[in-house]
Amino acid sequence: MIFEKKTLLGLDIGSQSIKLVDLAKVRGGYELKSLGLGLIPAECIVDKDIMDSETVVDTIKNLRENLKLRARGTASAISGHSVIVKKAELPLMSQAELQQTLMIEAEQYIPFDINDVYLDSFILGESLERSDMMDVLFVASKKELVDDYSSAIRNAGLKPMLMDIDVFALETMYEVNYPDAPESVVALVDVGASMININVLKDGMSIFARDISMGGRQLTER
């Protein structure tokens, strides 16, 4: 979900800490200009839902002030039980045609009331099994989750300009850092404090994406 296009700060709202990063694009890659991390109590974020917005907002504000950042636009990502990623096989059509029938096509794959979610779709390509069909990726998130994160960002004095899904943000990071990686099967795994994000790529395309409600905190407590 893209709100507008400008220079962005990276904002990661995790269940144990909040990270804010400022990168500059330079020849040959990116340069780290600023990086900040603020710890938050475990009860602030539960199953990726914001339970204590005041603490989250104050932590983001403090990070921005301590780093003396002038930019306000942010890119962030969400995951958890309120986010659904489904692969479907549909008759061949253009992206424009798919957008026109998006709500109808997605309703059978999304286990939420279709009116309660923000929805997007991506055509992955022609089906390997049938030439008259195509593979489509449906991505949906409950509006409440996106709106809660967006509100926290705005209340901290920043502007939510891009909201991604954690597994696909992980994929983008991989593509940026390893542009010349050979096309094969690659498993991207991000182990957070309370969530594990997995994205399996084959020939540069996501074939399996999953969030697991378990992370480093549970492993440490054992």
Where are the language model's segments positioned?
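Short flexible coil/turn linkers enriched for glycine and charged/polar residues
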Residues: 2-5, 14-17, 70, 80-82, ...
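Short, ordered loop/turn segments at secondary-structure junctions
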Residues: 25, 165-168, 212
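Structured core elements
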Residues: 10-12, 19, 75-77, 137, ...
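Conserved active-site and cofactor/substrate-binding residues in soluble primary-metabolism enzymes
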Residues: 51, 55, 144, 214, ...
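Active-site neighborhood for divalent-cation/phosphate handling
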Residues: 77-177
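Oxyanion-binding/catalytic loops of NTP- or PPi-dependent enzymes
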Residues: 35-45, 128, 175-222
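Non-catalytic, solvent-exposed interaction/assembly segments
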Residues: 1-105, 147-149, 157-159, 184
